[in-house]
C-alpha cells in the first residue's frame, strides 16, 4: 500500500475512532487503523515477503475459525489472504459472523493471470458487490502472458503507475452485514500444481522472522505515535475480547506467569508461546 494511503485510508472507509478494527492475515504490513491482528502462520515464512510486524495485540488463529463472539468487531480488514484459502466459503462466512462490516482486497482475477503467485489458488473479482471466485488449475496457467508481463514491469515508471492505479489491479469489496459470494469450483485442488499452499497447520514453539524492509519499519515507528490519535483501542486486554473456540466462553489468564489461558465455562486451555496467544483447535488441551 502506498505510504499516503496507509495514513488516510481509514477515513475513506468511514472507520470511527471508537470502532474496534480486526485485521486477518496482517503479516508484515498491517493497516494503520487495525486494533487487533490475526495471523495463523507466524511460525512459517512461506506466505510472507517481509518480517512479521507485531506492534499491537496479535492473536494466532485461523481466519476460518475465529475466536471472537458474533458481531463483536466493528470492522474487519482482510487484504491479500482470500486468494490463498482452500475453503473460501467457510472463511468468508466467518468474517461476516464476527464483523459488522469490513473490507476485502485481493489481486484482480485478470491481474493474477498476468502476475500469478505460487500460493494463489483462486481468481477473484467483484461483480456488482458479489465476490466471484474461480478455481485455478495451477499456479501459472498462462506462462506466455506471464513472461510478457514480466518484461513490461521493467519499463521505467511501471510500479509508480501500479500504485496510482490500485483499484485497476486489485479486487476491492466493502461489505456491510454479510459478504455475498459465488464460488466456481469443478473439482478438488491438485496442490502439487501450486507452490506455498498451506493445507494444514503444524504447531510450533516460536516465530519465524524475515528481514523487515525500511518502508515497513518506518510505518511501524510512525504508527506508535499516530494510532492513539485515531483509535480508542490502543490498550487492549486480548483475553477479555476473545472467546473459547469450543463453547464461546470467556478466557482468563490466571496469573502473569501462566503459559496458557483457560475457558471459564469448559476449562479448555489455549497456549501462550513466544508471548503470543495461540487460539487454534489443534493446540488446545483439556
Region locations from a protein language model:
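Residues immediately within or flanking Cys/His clusters that coordinate Zn2+
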Residues: 241, 260
Amino acid at each position: 500500500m502506498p505510504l499516503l494511503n496507509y495514513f488516510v485510508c481509514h477515513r475513506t472507509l468511514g472507520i470511527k475512532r471508537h470502532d474496534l478494527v480486526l485485521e486477518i492475515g496482517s503479516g508484515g504490513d498491517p493497516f494503520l487503523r487495525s486494533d487487533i491482528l490475526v495471523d495463523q502462520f507466524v511460525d512459517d515464512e512461506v506466505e510472507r515477503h517481509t518480517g512479521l510486524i507485531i506492534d499491537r495485540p496479535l492473536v494466532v488463529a485461523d481466519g476460518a475459525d475465529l475466536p471472537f463472539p458474533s458481531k463483536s468487531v466493528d470492522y474487519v480488514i482482510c487484504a491479500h489472504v482470500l486468494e490463498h484459502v482452500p475453503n473460501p466459503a467457510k472463511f468468508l462466512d466467518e468474517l461476516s459472523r464476527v464483523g459488522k462490516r469490513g473490507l476485502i482486497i485481493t489481486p484482480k482475477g485478470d491481474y493474477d493471470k498476468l502476475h500469478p503467485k505460487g500460493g494463489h489458488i483462486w481468481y477473484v473479482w467483484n461483480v456488482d458487490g458479489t465476490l466471484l471466485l474461480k478455481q485455478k488449475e495451477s499456479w501459472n496457467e498462462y506462462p506466455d502472458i506471464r513472461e510478457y508481463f514480466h518484461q513490461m514491469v521493467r519499463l521505467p515508471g511501471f510500479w509508480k503507475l501500479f500504485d496510482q492505479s490500485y483499484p485497476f489491479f486489485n479486487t476491492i469489496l466493502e461489505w456491510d452485514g454479510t459478504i455475498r459470494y459465488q464460488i466456481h469450483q469443478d473439482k478438488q485442488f491438485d496442490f502439487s500444481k501450486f507452490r506455498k499452499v498451506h493445507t494444514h497447520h503444524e504447531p510450533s514453539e516460536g516465530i519465524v522472522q524475515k528481514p523487515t524492509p525500511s518502508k515497513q519499519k518506518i510505518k511501524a515507528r510512525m504508527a506508535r505515535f499516530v494510532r492513539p490519535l485515531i483509535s480508542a483501542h490502543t490498550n487492549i486486554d486480548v483475553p477479555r475480547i476473545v472467546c473459547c473456540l469450543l463453547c464461546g466462553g470467556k478466557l482468563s489468564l490466571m496469573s502473569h506467569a501462566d503459559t496458557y489461558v483457560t475457558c471459564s465455562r469448559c476449562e479448555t486451555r489455549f497456549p501462550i508461546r513466544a508471548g503470543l496467544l495461540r487460539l487454534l483447535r489443534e493446540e488446545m488441551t483439556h
